[in-house]
Curated annotation (Swiss-Prot):
It catalyses: tRNA(Ile) + L-isoleucine + ATP = L-isoleucyl-tRNA(Ile) + AMP + diphosphate. GO terms for biological process: isoleucyl-tRNA aminoacylation. It is an enzyme of class 6 (ligase). It comes from Geobacter sulfurreducens (strain ATCC 51573 / DSM 12127 / PCA). This is Isoleucine--tRNA ligase. Belongs to the class-I aminoacyl-tRNA synthetase family. IleS type 1 subfamily. The gene is ileS.
Length: 923
């Protein structure tokens, strides 16, 4: 007789080979055809809402691995929230305006760019952004990210542009918006002002020079030792090109300064920097006087090569960190210089044009590019005898985020949002303390930035963006930027988009009957600057959260890379607090950057770039999702082929566990066959205890956003508790009758384990969980993504049972080692060929005797004999004290059906090759 048909072997159509690169698109197509996200949204109606607001990626180029990390993290959180019973919508967005797109379009136009009107340029920029919105949307969807992809928010949509203009109008209404001349980060290559977030720092070698400014006023009355002497203040700078713009020298009011007599002249430096100055310049001299800075206040120095004075001022910004303690002050080229000049009534002088060249009228250097002029300025200083010393310094210097070229500080007429008006700075700092920051250091980072930042420069001298909706009276030059006018224009933009600004004349854009409040005339011209793109994305709380009924403000979470403390988190905070008084988010979570396996930054030149598309083609998006979950994303996140291969192996283990469970549930109906907990075997109850521990651990990991803990918990559960122990032991139940209590008990556990496992892993392994779900008996929903996490069952926790089974597992571990030794010595082949004798001390023996009937199953051997410690000379166990283990060939014949050896085989004439247990099972 063929007994194979009487065995309960695992049967399932669930494929062993994942074949993810081919299977995932099929699952994705099914989600789209069945409108899975729409179904989820309907199911969420009436549930408590959880809003994670999507920071918009830039609609330029294909997605990179950092995008994948970000979008998958968001997707994991939102899916976990839905499975916890929340209505958790996801509205993706794109940042569509700005310099990178405009520069790319200019590049594509080539020489034709000079013939292109602003309107034509904007049309091409819009088409370019639309193209990459479509490209990136498909790439994000391919990652398994569920969302309202058919209705994303775009910062270039008419309603978004209109709301952006409306938010600007609100700042005009509350007095926060103003126009002024201030030094701002300026890219002479891109010909525009830059926001703090558009500035990157890179190492640069700059000249380091010491320059003397001859004191014009005699201070002999206050410092007699200096009477009648030629006295100069020495400044230090790494930007010689700003010397032509010098208007002052700043000293610290609380510092002591020394007069060094050297070669017939006197040089003044801070006492605390005297030695460093002398070492750097080689100047030798004696200190002939020490005095406080205040005696020099408002005294006149002569500019080194221009016929004008440089005034001595006092400033708290002067430090002893480097230089001389006498600070070169050019109000048109530095924030602190500018602030001091405002207090002291100096001009905000800037002799540099938009393209980084000195104005033609500047004596000696007119028309020169500023960085090229460094050498010429130094030569001029040498010529007039003002150069005290020179060298070079390697330092971190600001560069443009887009063209990567060094930038300058340059005073220009710009539009600003005041940090002091309406107490914006203090209100923002207060709101920061009401937000939960993950990791916690995020709070200190953004707090320091807001505390020390200048007014927000929101104007850009480009074409592709939302115009600053201000007007100028052509008669008297008065600025018209009031709430009524700007709200009127915002309404026009809502209906027809911001291109109207370029299509219509000023008179067509203004409210009827508008006249200049200053002179009463009615002829106006339009402001041609556009808004900083960080203002665009910063008002998304108004344009998206408040504008879409399924969302709401403030959002529960903003989640982006750690660079966004100075970017989107920052601009969003100011935009919201500035008009509403509250932060737009309750919690902010940040992740690090993606680096290679050695921790190096990714770079095309190094050749270590890992593209999401390549990973998906080779491994599938599921492995990318597992990679995101497996990392502690709060630091920089490593990725390499080795890491991905390791994760692919972990994925296979999880998949195979699910497949094995499915295979053993092919004839199980949970409504009919489920065995109650109190009628299960001890081993089965042990498995449910472990399942409950897993559920608690995973739930906590989701709540704390510690997905690496979740990954290790699920992987460990599948590998250790299930495959290596529980599933290994219960395999023997395949020989039981179909409806045998012990088999149904194991099936009940396997069903509960699989149901929990598949829902717990669904936010991470979204494709596989849904694939497994499709094969499950009696699933509650059509997709796992419509299901909820399993309920907690605290009654399944049994610590005393776990302690007992920990002892059994320890004994099993030692038995396995003894079996391996016997295998090496050719005493046995398979473990079922073995009979094991355990000689144990009284306490352990008594404990093991309680499980005497189960030990052969637990050890996967044919027979186990328990004897007292002194009986027989067996080798001592490696781990468990008071235990000796003997292994011998099992007596009896091998059962044809279960492969156990048994001395009673042949006792049943109908089934002479079966053991009694199998003979009973087949009858």
């Amino acid at each position: 007789m063929d007994y194979k048909s009487t065995l309960n072997l695992p049967v399932t159509d669930f494929p062993m080979k994942a074949n993810l690169p081919q299977r995932e698109p099929e699952i994705l197509a099914a989600w789209q055809q069945g409108d899975l996200y729409g179904t989820i949204a309907k199911a969420g109606k009436g549930k408590p809402r959880y809003v994670l607001h999507d920071g918009p990626p830039y609609a330029n180029g294909h997605i990179h691995i950092g995008h994948a990390l970000n979008k998958i993290l968001k997707d994991i959180i939102l899916k976990s929230k839905r499975m916890q019973g929340f209505d958790a919508p996801y509205v993706p967005g794109w940042d569509c305006h700005g310099l990178p797109i405009e520069l790319q379009v200019e590049k594509n136009l080539g020489s034709k760019k000079h013939e292109t009107t602003k309107l034509q340029m904007r049309k091409q920029c819009r088409e370019y952004a639309e193209k990459f919105v479509h490209v990136q949307r498909a790439e994000f969807e391919r990652l398994g990210v569920l969302g309202d992809w058919d209705r994303p928010y775009l910062t270039m949509s008419y309603d978004y542009e209109g709301i952006t203009a409306r938010e600007l109008a609100r700042f005009a209404e509350n007095g926060g918006l103003y126009k002024g001349k201030k030094p701002v980060h300026w890219c002479s290559s891109c010909v525009t002002a830059l926001a703090e977030a558009e500035v990157e720092y890179a190492d640069k070698t700059s000249p380091s020079i010491y320059v003397k400014f001859l004191l014009q006023d005699d201070i002999g009355g206050a410092v007699p030792a200096l009477a009648g002497k030629r006295v100069s203040l020495v400044i230090w700078t790494t930007t010689p090109w700003t010397i032509p713009a010098n208007l002052a020298v700043a000293l610290h009011p609380e510092l002591d300064y020394v007069a060094l007599e050297t070669g017939g002249e006197v040089l003044v430096v801070a006492e605390g920097l005297k030695d460093a100055f002398m070492a750097a310049t080689g100047v030798q001299g004696d200190v002939i006087a020490t005095f406080r800075a205040d005696i020099l206040y408002r005294k006149r120095c002569k500019h080194p090569f221009y016929d004008r004075d440089s005034i001595v001022l006092l400033g708290e910004h002067v430090t002893l960190d480097a230089g001389t303690g006498c600070v070169h002050t050019a109000p048109g080229h530095g924030q602190e210089d500018y602030e001091l000049a405002l207090v002291e009534g100096l001009d905000i002088y800037n002799p540099v044009d938009n393209r980084g060249r000195y104005i033609q009228s500047l004596e000696f250097f007119g028309g020169m590019f500023v960085f090229d002029a460094n050498a010429a300025v130094m030569e001029k200083l040498r010529e007039v005898g003002a150069l005290v010393g020179q060298g070079s310094v390697e330092h971190s210097y600001p560069h443009c985020w887009r063209c990567k070229k060094p930038i300058i500080f340059r005073a220009t007429e710009q539009w600003f949002i005041s940090m002091e008006k309406n107490d914006l700075r203090q209100k923002a700092l207060t709101e920061i303390d009401r937000v939960s920051w993950v990791p916690k250091w995020g709070r200190e980072r953004i707090h320091g930035m807001i505390e020390n930042r200048p007014d927000w420069c929101i104007s850009r001298q480009r074409s592709w963006g939302v115009p600053i909706t201000a007007f100028y009276c052509t008669e008297c030059g008065e600025i018209l930027a009031d709430g009524k006018t700007m709200h009127h224009v915002a309404d026009l933009f809502m209906a027809g988009g911001a291109d109207l600004w370029y299509e219509k004349e000023a008179a067509e854009l203004l409210p009827p009957g508008t006249v200049c409040p200053q002179c009463g005339k009615s002829a106006f011209e339009k402001e041609m600057d556009i808004l900083d793109v960080w203002f665009d994305s910063g008002v998304s709380h108004a344009a998206v959260l408040e504008n879409r009924p399924e969302l709401g403000s403030p959002a529960n979470m903003y989640l982006e890379g750690s660079d966004q403390h100075r970017g989107w988190f920052h601009s969003s905070l100011l935009a919201s607090v500035g008009t509403r008084g509250v932060a737009p988010y309750r919690e902010v979570l940040t992740h690090g950057f993606v680096v290679d396996g050695s921790g190096r930054k990714m770079s095309k030149s190094v050749g270590n770039v890992v593209a999401p598309e390549e990973v998906i083609k080779k491994y599938g998006a599921e492995i990318l999702r597992l990679w995101v979950a497996a990392q502690d994303y709060r630091d920089d996140v490593r990725i390499s082929q080795e890491i991905l291969t390791r994760l692919a192996e972990a994925y296979r283990r999880i998949r195979n566990t699910c497949r094995y469970l499915l295979g053993n549930l092919n004839d199980f109906d949970p409504d009919v066959d489920m065995v109650p907990y109190d009628r299960m075997t001890e081993l089965d109850r042990w498995a449910l205890h472990q399942l409950e521990v897993l559920k608690e651990k995973v739930a906590a990991a989701y709540n704390e956003y510690e997905f690496h803990i979740l990954y290790h918990a699920v992987n460990g559960f599948c590998t250790v508790e299930m495959s290596a122990f529980y599933l290994d032991i219960i395999k023997e139940r395949y020989t039981s009758r179909k409806d045998a209590p012990e088999r149904r008990s194991a099936q009940s556990v396997m069903y509960l384990v699989l149901e929990s496992l598949v829902t717990l892993m669904a936010p991470v392994l979204s494709f596989t969980a849904d694939e497994v779900w499709g094969y499950m008996p009696k699933r509650s929903e059509s997709s796992v993504h419509l299901a909820t996490f399993p309920e907690f069952r605290p009654e399944w926790k049994d610590e005393s049972l776990v302690e007992r089974w920990a002892r059994i597992m320890a004994v099993r571990g030692d038995v396995s080692k003894a079996l391996e030794q016997a295998r090496v010595q050719k005493t046995i082949g398979h473990s079922l060929d073995a009979a094991v004798t355990l000689a144990a001390e009284p306490g352990l023996l008594s404990f093991l005797q309680e499980y005497a009937g189960e030990l052969s199953t637990i050890f996967i051997v044919s027979r186990v004999d328990l004897v007292e410690e002194g009986a027989g000379d067996y080798p001592a166990a490696e781990g468990v004290s008071g235990l000796r283990i003997g292994v011998s060939a099992a007596p009896g014949e091998k059962c044809e059906r279960c492969w156990h050896y048994d001395e009673e085989i042949g006792g049943d004439s109908e089934h002479p090759t079966l053991c009694p247990k199998c003979a009973a099972a087949v009858k």
